[in-house]
Curated annotation (Swiss-Prot):
The lineage of its organism: Bacteria, Bacillati, Actinomycetota, Actinomycetes, Mycobacteriales. Zn(2+) binds at residues 97, 99, 118, 122. InterPro entries: Glu-Q_tRNA(Asp)_Synthase (IPR022380), Glu/Gln-tRNA-synth (IPR000924), Glu/Gln-tRNA-synth_Ib_cat-dom (IPR020058), GluQ/Sye (IPR049940), Rossmann-like_a/b/a_fold (IPR014729). The gene is gluQ. It is an enzyme of class 6 (ligase). The keyword GTP-binding does not apply. This is Glutamyl-Q tRNA(Asp) synthetase. Catalyzes the tRNA-independent activation of glutamate in presence of ATP and the subsequent transfer of glutamate onto a tRNA(Asp). Glutamate is transferred on the 2-amino-5-(4,5-dihydroxy-2-cyclopenten-1-yl) moiety of the queuosine in the wobble position of the QUC anticodon. HAMAP family: Glu_Q_tRNA_synth. GO terms for molecular function: ATP binding; glutamate-tRNA ligase activity; zinc ion binding.
Length: 297
């Protein structure tokens, strides 16, 4: 193992108990950090205040501790970092967006638009047009969203497993509008990773398409992008992403969860220290793990 002194992290969203897929990703994040001589940190991603709860966060931290997982500083919480995001926003080119979700969906059906990307409806409005839309929202008790004014269509990142990745960059949301403005995930995660010294991000490969956007934000903010490691998801028998509706899949419902995580990683050890001794990231399978509810270890 190396002696590099960067940091990896696990950053759960506290909206419920950790399930098998969450625990597997947490273990992989810990293994990668320790294998490369990095510190390991926990950040509670409760930037979405309406879906997060301190009770869920406490239960998740208890579960990670019960696995034998350790971290090198007290867990941090995004709800304490809003001043950071406000400061970052001041350093980013942005504009107000008055579109509803329905507006964006309808605009995205127009010819020559890229599915899933914001079509730029509010990007070049005149100040008179902006004031009209601002007042219309105010009558509804809402405020505009804030979007990045991106000056490139794509951005390049390198992932440990996927290699070179060129991904789309659009005018992404930085702060959501509505009755209660919320900071957007892409901005929050980039700002927090930089502030916390995170230089290794291990997470599910469903987030691979977010990496170019986040790396571009890091570039605009003048901070280094982390090394990305996107790992396969855990799927149910139907080939869909594992969810709580699939049955007894949470850690608290599975007393044998760590041995099963080890099995899914091709490791024979049944403790985290033992798994670390065996772990070789270059031998880790890149195929999704199919979770069998009643499978015996």
């Amino acid at each position: 193992m190396g002696t590099f002194q960067g940091a990896g992290r696990y950053a759960p969203s506290p909206s419920g108990d950790l399930h098998f897929g969450n625990v597997r990703t947490a273990v992989l994040a810990w293994l990668f950090a320790r294998h490369t001589g990095r510190r390991f940190l926990i950040r509670v991603e409760d930037v979405d205040t309406q879906r997060s709860s301190l009770e869920s966060a406490a239960r998740q931290l208890e579960d990670l501790h019960a696995l034998g997982m350790d971290w090198d500083a007290a867990p941090t919480y995004q709800h304490n970092n809003f001043d950071r995001y406000e400061q970052a926003l001041r350093n980013l080119p942005h504009y107000e967006c008055y579109c509803s979700r329905k507006d964006i969906q309808e605009a995205s059906r127009a010819p020559h638009t890229i599915p899933g990307q914001y079509p730029g409806t509010c990007r070049n409005l005149t100040e008179v047009q902006r004031e009209e839309r601002r007042q219309a929202l105010a009558k509804q008790g809402r405020v505009p969203a804030l979007r990045l004014r991106a000056d490139v269509p794509t951005w390049h990142v390198r992932d440990y497993y996927a290699g070179d990745v060129l991904g789309d960059v659009d005018d992404m949301i930085l702060r959501r509008g509505g009755q209660q403005p919320d900071w957007a995930y892409n901005l929050a995660v980039v700002v927090d990773d930089a502030a916390d010294g995170i230089d290794q991000v291990v997470r599910g490969n469903d987030l691979l398409t977010s990496a170019p956007r986040q790396a571009y934000l890091a570039h605009l903010l003048g901070v280094p992008a982390p090394t990305y490691v996107h790992v396969p998801l855990v799927l149910n028998a139907a080939g869909q992403r594992l969810a709580k509706r699939d049955g007894a899949v949470t850690m608290r419902e599975m007393p044998d969860i760590l041995p099963r995580v080890a099995e899914s990683l091709g490791l024979s050890a049944r403790t985290l220290p033992g798994m670390l001794e065996e772990f070789d990231p270059d031998r880790f399978s890149q195929q999704p793990w199919i979770f069998a509810i009643h499978k015996e270890v």
